[in-house]
Amino acid sequence: MDRYVTDIKNGCYQNPVLPMDFSDPDAIRVGENYYLISSSFTYLPGVPVLHSKDLVHWERIGNCVERLPFDRYAQPAHGCGTWAPALRYHAGRFYAFIPLPDEGIFYTEATDPAGPWSALHCVKSASGWIDPCPLWDDDGSVYMAHAFAKSRCGIKHKIQLSRLDPETLEVVEDGPIVFDGTLSQPTAEGPKMYKRNGWYYIFIPAGGVEYGWQTVLRARNVYGPYEEKIVMHQGASSINGPHQGAWVTAPDGSDWFLHFQDRFELGRVVHLQPMCWHSDWPFICLLYTSDAADE
């Protein structure tokens, strides 16, 4: 059997660009370098860090978490540990926001993404808070969007926006539910926050891991009200349930979206899709042709 390669040597690539289990990826670009992290549950060292120069060739360079500061993790705990993290770069430091669904939201920081990373610092002690993503706003305010795990707190389909202390990055105000996807975007989760041209954007997967889709929310005010648009779904493609991921902009100005696909026994593999803009909405495709969701 031929060895799988992502770079097919004609200026093109093939998906998945990470044909292995890197669940719940988030990614950023700093200068000429891209960095990606993913969840790892109770595997330790955890929350792997990958590096790339081109979004296609990736190399693992370290881990954000050496140990979890709770005795229960001395033994494997199925479905627990580090869930979907977020990676951000602010004022010369890398920040990884990491949820533990039974204990709360934590962050770790580093000046070098290869490490060392600091010990975990508690942002919010809570059961059922998951999938955090911070946003440093232009006026110095810091916010964190997150979802909920129904298995822990009985809440589902909702995105909450909390305000953080700019110095400690701890929650100072839980804040409102800014989006309720119960009717139109069930299982809304995995929020990733961005700001562009005065718009606040929250990218969310919905519909569940196996057969879901990618939705984008946008608003002029960080607290909403948020409009919603489905921007990518499976359609007639073989890529089931294009799930949560990250928007990155390349040095040449092109936009890209990394997301995972659940391949069952192969794990959650990572795909790379081109992204473009029309009327301040992102569309996950090479060229905008219509407002219909892309595949």
Question: What are these model-derived regions, one by one?
Answer:
Residues 288-294:
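Conserved small/polar residues in nucleotide/adenosyl-binding loops
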Residues 38-64:
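Beta-propeller domains
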Residues 233-278:
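Repeat-solenoid scaffold signature
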Residues 4-17, 58-75, 108-126, 165-186, ...:
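Blade-edge beta-strand/turn elements of extracellular beta-propeller
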Residues 147, 160-163:
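Active-site neighborhood of glycoside hydrolase catalytic domains
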